[in-house]
């Protein structure tokens, strides 16, 4: 692979002009102007994920992703104003971050700043809202992890790879009961600890100037106060010194083999080499592992 792609991955050189600014409340802004489109995209990344959960209260980061669409301080329904503005949105959570993004026509871009800043300021917390979203997430847990073949692979594999680090449980949570037992007070505490301008990065790209982006960010996000975000103290995962193996027998259509190796972090220059290598070996019908194990040539 190194002979094919070079001894080391070189950084990508681009003529894209990226603007950056940090506001007094700690919000970091990243901007790129693209006049070839009539749309503008806003993306907010909060520095919180499943790794920040208590081992006995897992699944909270993902649950909270759902709660963020349940209404905020001055906007009882998030989706309706966005749809009226011609926009669309989505979100996802992983072990490290929670990501929210939306796109709107450039003529309605201020609606996007208004919506995102208001739910960063404060959500509408209610027992009814929690019950609804808790039910949605529990059904997702059942559908993905309990009711289909191989659905619990993440729950089986992660504890093999990580013994003490919170990467040892999947984003959706270790157990269904953790989500079922989530209380409103716990949800509020999670919000005020992690959902803060000084724990977020706002990226804006599309047909909007840097000056207008700064103005709208200052107008809508500037009044959102800083919060006391806890210092992250994660346990250090000890080095793996021997092979770890687990065999599970199930009534499933086909056998499955899952293998994993510890590798460098994303900031390492070799990360992209390993990422490409993983795709070549095992991603898709043309991957090497599939071709070499197939009973007939393809």
Model-derived features: positions:
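Short, low-order "capping/linker" segments at domain edges
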Residues: 243-249
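Charge-rich, well-structured scaffold segments of protease-associated domains
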Residues: 18, 22, 79-229, 236-238, ...
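Short, low-complexity Ser/Thr-rich regulatory SLiMs
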Residues: 33-35, 93, 250
């Amino acid at each position: 692979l190194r002979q094919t792609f070079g001894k080391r991955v070189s950084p990508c050189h681009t003529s894209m002009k990226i603007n950056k600014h940090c506001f007094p409340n700690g919000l970091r802004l990243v901007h790129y102007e693209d006049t070839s489109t009539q749309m503008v995209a806003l993306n907010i990344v909060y520095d919180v994920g499943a790794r920040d959960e208590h081992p006995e209260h897992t699944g909270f980061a993902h649950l909270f992703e759902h709660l963020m669409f349940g209404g905020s301080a001055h906007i009882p329904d998030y989706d309706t104003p966005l749809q009226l503005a011609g926009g669309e949105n989505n979100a996802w959570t992983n072990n490290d971050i929670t990501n929210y993004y939306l796109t709107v026509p450039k003529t309605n871009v201020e609606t996007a700043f208004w919506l995102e800043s208001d739910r960063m300021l404060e959500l509408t917390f209610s027992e009814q809202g929690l019950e609804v979203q808790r039910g949605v997430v529990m059904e997702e847990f059942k559908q993905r992890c309990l009711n289909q073949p191989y659905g619990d692979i993440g729950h089986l594999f992660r504890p093999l790879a990580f013994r003490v680090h919170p990467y040892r449980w999947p984003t959706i949570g270790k157990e269904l009961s953790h989500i079922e037992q989530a209380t409103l007070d716990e949800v509020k505490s999670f919000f005020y600890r992690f959902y803060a301008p000084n724990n977020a990065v706002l990226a804006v790209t599309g047909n909007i100037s840097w000056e207008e982006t700064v103005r709208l960010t200052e107008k809508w996000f500037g009044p959102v106060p800083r919060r006391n975000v806890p210092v992250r103290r994660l346990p250090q995962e000890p080095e793996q010194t021997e092979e770890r193996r687990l065999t599970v027998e199930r009534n499933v259509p086909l056998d499955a083999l899952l293998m994993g190796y510890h590798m460098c972090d994303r900031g390492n220059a070799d990360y992209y080499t390993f990422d490409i290598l993983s795709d070549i070996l095992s991603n898709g019908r043309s991957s090497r592992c599939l071709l070499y194990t197939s009973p007939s040539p393809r």
